[in-house]
Amino acid sequence: VLGSRGLGDVYKRQVVIATSGPGATNLVTGIATAYMDSIPMVAITGNVTRDLLGLDSFQEVDICGITMPITKHNYIVKDPAELADIIREAFYIANEGRKGPVLIDIPKDITGALMVYEKKEPKKVVNHNPKGINEEIAAAAELIKNAEKPFIYAGGGVVSADATEEMAEFARKVDAPVSLSLMGQCALDNTKDCYIGMLGMHGTKTAAMTLSECDLMIVLGSRFSDRVLCNAKTFAKDKKIIHIDIDPAEIGKNIDVYSHVTGDVKYILAKLCELLPDMEHEAWMNTVMDWKKQYALRMVPIESEDEVLPQDVIEELSLIHISEPTRP
């Protein structure tokens, strides 16, 4: 059960199973993490028999009520004939649109019930992943074309949309510095020159300077966490922000934006790459690279003849593994 909490910290579809009562409640932290990080997860919990539900029975807990604010959907199975359809639907919901956790609560007598399985034809479902409105994409492209100091900030939405290739091509096309959120660390190869570290509380001075001096911030699949904003009233003040995200609820939730595109990040990035020419911002990029060199994160040297320090091992491995970084 404790291990299942770690399963919420990966990007692919996950399944976790727990017994009733304390087993189910031990899943809550993992489910909440998956919900906040948009990780597809199907959590299956046991419960008391149907005739004991609602009677404060031994190890009975209203896990559906507890997890309602932190799941996309949850189910209490009341008929064994419904179980197969519920499981199929749960996996679909977990992966549809903005990904997230779904919970299935199964009473004990359902798990032991006998039923005749009827093979069913797969249901045709409507894909609710919005592609993005072409007019919004075109408007975003015009803003990017006219920017002199663009800055790209990418989050976990790029990774969950499997848009890393499109992200790399977009960064190359726009010729802009790139910062990644904690969940977006796999969105771009961070050995590229254009990568300048994270923003906000865990960020670099280079990223802060870039945000301060840019004239356009392009935000891809990120929800503007308070770890990044720090102060929403002063964050990117007087900057034009384009927010691209699959979840319309995130647009304007934590910060006002100048323009937005709601839809699948992979599709939108591909369309933007079609609309944009190969751009050059040599003076801007040279300035950012100077900051990156001046404010580079460095290990503080510690002299030790008797022991090998972990930071020295990591630095040496990095030097061996990483070749000279290049622009995308």
Which residues does each predicted region cover?
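Single conserved hydrophobic/aromatic residue that forms the stacking wall/gate
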Residues: 1-7, 11, 320-328
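Glycine-rich oxoanion-binding loops at beta->alpha junctions
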Residues: 4-17, 73, 193-210
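Structural signature of the thiamine diphosphate
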Residues: 12-18, 26-29, 34-45, 68-120, ...
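Active-site-proximal loop->helix
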Residues: 48-69, 190-195, 252, 256
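Glycine-rich beta-alpha junction loops
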Residues: 48-49, 106-112, 156-158, 184-185, ...
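Phosphate/pyrophosphate-binding active-site segments
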Residues: 81, 142, 147, 238-319, ...
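Aromatic-enriched
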Residues: 108-135, 139, 284, 295, ...
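Glycine-rich, anion-gripping cofactor-binding loops and their flanking helix/strand elements
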Residues: 158-242
